Amino acid sequence: MAHKKAGGSSKNGRDSAGKRLGVKRFGGQQVTAGSILVRQRGTTIHPGANVGCGKDYTLYALVDGVVSFERKGKDKKKVSVYAQ
């Protein structure tokens, strides 16, 4: 009898959609209050002057101004917004 043994099921073959994380406004760019500057998982970049931090660690501008990325100590980064 020509039978075929049942094939095993694969445990692979899934992937999640990208979450569109990263820097949304770069250094030197003009922004308005409420503009999202960085979307991130955890505080990869810390909030500086005139920047707020959402519950999902999204950094956003609190005032109109110019974006500036700076160092915070030796090994941390921060983003600030300076009013023009």
From Swiss-Prot:
Keyword annotations for this protein, in alphabetical order, are: Ribonucleoprotein, Ribosomal protein
Q: Where is this region: Disordered?
A: 1-25
Gene3D superfamilies linked: 2.40.50.100
Q: Which SUPFAM superfamilies match?
A: Ribosomal L27 protein-like (SSF110324)
Q: Which InterPro entries match?
A: Ribosomal_bL27 (IPR001684), Ribosomal_bL27_CS (IPR018261)
GO annotations of cellular component type = cytosolic large ribosomal subunit
PANTHER family reported for this sequence? LARGE RIBOSOMAL SUBUNIT PROTEIN BL27M, RIBOSOMAL PROTEIN L27
The name this protein carries in UniProt is: Large ribosomal subunit protein bL27
Q: Which organism is it from?
A: Syntrophotalea carbinolica (strain DSM 2380 / NBRC 103641 / GraBd1)
